[in-house]
Amino acid sequence: MLMPKRVKHRKQFRGSMAGKATRGNKITNGEYGIVALEPCWIKANQIEAARVAMTRYIKRGGKVWIKIFPEKPVTHKPMGVRMGKGKGALEYWVAVVKPGRVLFEISGVPEDVAKEALRLATHKLPCKCKVVSRADLEGGESNEN
């Protein structure tokens, strides 16, 4: 599971997901990618499930890049515990994703295989996503509908 090796502060505020992604919104390594269409938190196990779905479909060919990393800790208090008495224990790690962020990239496989692998991966993610090519994003179609 993805998580930071060490962190300065074990517990964080929830923060906000307002606005669009200003960084990580271009395809840099691969030929095709998944772009988020809405803001969400993506858990480490969801990222891993999407990666496994893609790599199993493309078998031995191609290369996959994971462009997000779960660096935000999320805490929960146990069931039936009253309010107060401090913040809850660390439960899991999430990657904060804004609209327009490229989540995964893939290359080295034919177009139909790449698009199907990315489509399978989008079903493992909690937010609406679309499959795009490098030409789509460079051609000015980066704005969402």
Swiss-Prot record:
Binds 23S rRNA and is also seen to make contacts with the A and possibly P site tRNAs. One of its GO terms (cellular component) is cytosolic large ribosomal subunit. The keyword tRNA-binding applies. Keywords: Ribonucleoprotein, Ribosomal protein, RNA-binding, rRNA-binding, tRNA-binding. PANTHER family: 50S/60S RIBOSOMAL PROTEIN L16, LARGE RIBOSOMAL SUBUNIT PROTEIN UL16M. HAMAP family: Ribosomal_uL16. It comes from Agathobacter rectalis (strain ATCC 33656 / DSM 3377 / JCM 17463 / KCTC 5835 / VPI 0990). Transmembrane segments: none annotated. Pfam families: Ribosomal_L16. GO terms for biological process: translation. InterPro entries: Ribosomal_uL16 (IPR047873), Ribosomal_uL16_bact-type (IPR000114), Ribosomal_uL16_CS (IPR020798), Ribosomal_uL16_dom (IPR016180), Ribosomal_uL16_sf (IPR036920). This is Large ribosomal subunit protein uL16. One of its GO terms (molecular function) is rRNA binding.
